């Protein structure tokens, strides 16, 4: 398995994986991925099995500690010098789930955020996934009123303080 950042040629594969992982109402389009990769391809963590994209994690950087719906749709909000790494999606093809691949990418995103001196990482998820992200040091901040994207309920936050408690 190879982990790397995204380039424009990855957009069709990103779109295909996203379409397998999320319902149409929640999935980002190829056009949205093209815009995201153009603005922050170095904040996409991709795992390839040979030449096949099997899993990816992505999100931009901002000074805002709250993940909002507008962020999903507006890649120009990315601020490379921002304090917080947002996580917009964690995607793994169904045939490759339960092998720890997404976890490896989450850990890489955390390591990169630490290396870049970010305050932490922010993601939203459905209730049933809170325990999964807790394994990586994310703390449940409760129900969010900042985002309804994908009918999420919980906002999770990872800070360097969380790493000290692991």
Each model region followed by its residue ranges:
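Active-site rim helix/loop that mediates acceptor-substrate recognition in acyltransferases
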Residues: 24-49, 58-77
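Residue-level recognition of the GNAT/N-acetyltransferase active site
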Residues: 93, 126
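Conserved acyl-donor/pantetheine-binding loop and adjacent beta-alpha core of acyl/acetyltransferases
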Residues: 55-90, 97, 107, 146-154
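A short beta-loop-alpha structural element at the N-terminal edge
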Residues: 2-14
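Conserved active-site alpha-helix within GNAT-family acetyltransferase domains
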Residues: 115, 127-150
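Conserved small/polar residues in nucleotide/adenosyl-binding loops
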Residues: 158-166
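Conserved GNAT acetyl-CoA-binding A-motif
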Residues: 113-125
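Glycine-rich acyl-CoA binding loop
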Residues: 98-106, 113
């Amino acid at each position: 398995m190879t982990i790397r950042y995204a380039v424009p040629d990855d957009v069709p594969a990103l779109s295909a994986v996203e379409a397998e992982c999320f319902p149409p109402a929640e999935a980002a389009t190829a056009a949205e991925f093209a815009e995201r990769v153009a603005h922050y391809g170095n904040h996409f963590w991709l795992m390839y099995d040979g030449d096949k994209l099997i899993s990816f994690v992505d999100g931009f950087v901002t000074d805002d500690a709250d993940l909002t719906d507008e962020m999903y749709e507006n890649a120009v909000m990315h601020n490379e010098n921002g304090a917080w790494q947002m996580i917009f999606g964690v995607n793994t093809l169904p045939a490759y789930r339960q092998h720890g691949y997404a976890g490896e990418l989450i850990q890489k995103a955390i390591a990169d955020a630490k290396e870049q001196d970010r305050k932490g990482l922010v993601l939203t998820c459905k209730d049933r996934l809170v325990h999964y992200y807790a394994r990586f040091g994310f703390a449940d901040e409760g129900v969010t009123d900042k985002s309804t994207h994908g009918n999420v309920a919980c906002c999770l936050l990872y800070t360097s303080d969380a790493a000290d408690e692991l």
